């Protein structure tokens, strides 16, 4: 049963990556009795909400597609506002109140890392579609990602600039207050 749920979570996360432009309201569908609850955490409001809304909509679309083929899952998502403390509080609500069996999210690296550590302690399967910090999956064997890491992206950009564009030097402009920007710049 756990492997089947993990397969659904992985499929939903992969479809989320392909469908991030779809629109929906981002709320949970609790209308199906007996449905297996899959949790979601994403910044649905705030500065990075564009990423959370897109990912959340893709996950909901994937769950809907899976259910259209005879399965019975429900997606319960909460807005963590791009904040690690909010993410932990929402995660605890998903586990305690909503009784989720797996988690898709978080979307950005700081909240994702905080939740990953707790999910590992709780033996909760978790996958992030977009959390790129290396430390996320180092939280444990229950934590997965469906995207490239910061170092990989930075190295690929540097390789492209050097090998394809012929650049011998580069000036890197980055935001020192943003972990994603720092991670890419350091690897470049």
Identify the meaning behind each predicted range.
Residues 143-188:
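An alpha-beta-alpha
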Residues 137-141:
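Glycine-rich, charge-decorated loop segments at or immediately adjacent to ligand/cofactor-binding or catalytic sites
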Residues 26-30, 51-55, 65-136, 146:
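Beta-alpha junction/loop-to-helix N-cap segments that form part of ligand/metal-binding clefts
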Residues 1-37, 67-69, 121:
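Short, low-complexity disordered leader/linker segments with a strong preference
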Residues 34-56, 106, 169-175:
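Short beta-strand segments enriched in small/hydrophobic residues
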Residues 60, 85-96, 113, 155-163, ...:
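Amphipathic, non-transmembrane alpha-helical secondary structure
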Residues 51-66, 86, 126, 153-156, ...:
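Short, solvent-exposed amphipathic alpha-helices that sit
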């Amino acid at each position: 049963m756990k492997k089947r749920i993990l397969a659904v979570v992985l499929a939903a996360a992969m479809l989320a990556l392909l469908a991030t432009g779809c629109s929906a309201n981002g709320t949970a569908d609790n209308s199906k009795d007996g449905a297996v609850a899959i949790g979601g955490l994403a910044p649905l409001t705030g500065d990075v909400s564009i990423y959370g809304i897109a990912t959340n909509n893709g996950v909901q679309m994937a769950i809907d597609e899976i259910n259209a083929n005879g399965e019975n899952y429900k997606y319960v998502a909460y807005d963590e506002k791009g904040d690690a403390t909010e993410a932990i509080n929402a995660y605890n609500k998903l586990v305690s109140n909503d009784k989720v069996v797996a988690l898709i999210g978080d979307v950005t690296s700081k909240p994702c890392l905080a939740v990953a550590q707790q999910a590992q302690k709780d033996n909760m399967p978790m996958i992030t579609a977009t959390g790129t910090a290396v430390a996320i999956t180092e939280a444990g064997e229950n934590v997965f990602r469906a995207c490239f890491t910061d170092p990989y992206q930075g190295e690929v950009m540097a390789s492209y600039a050097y090998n394809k564009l012929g650049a011998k030097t580069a000036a890197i402009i980055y935001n020192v207050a943003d972990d994603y920007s720092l991670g890419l710049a350091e690897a470049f």
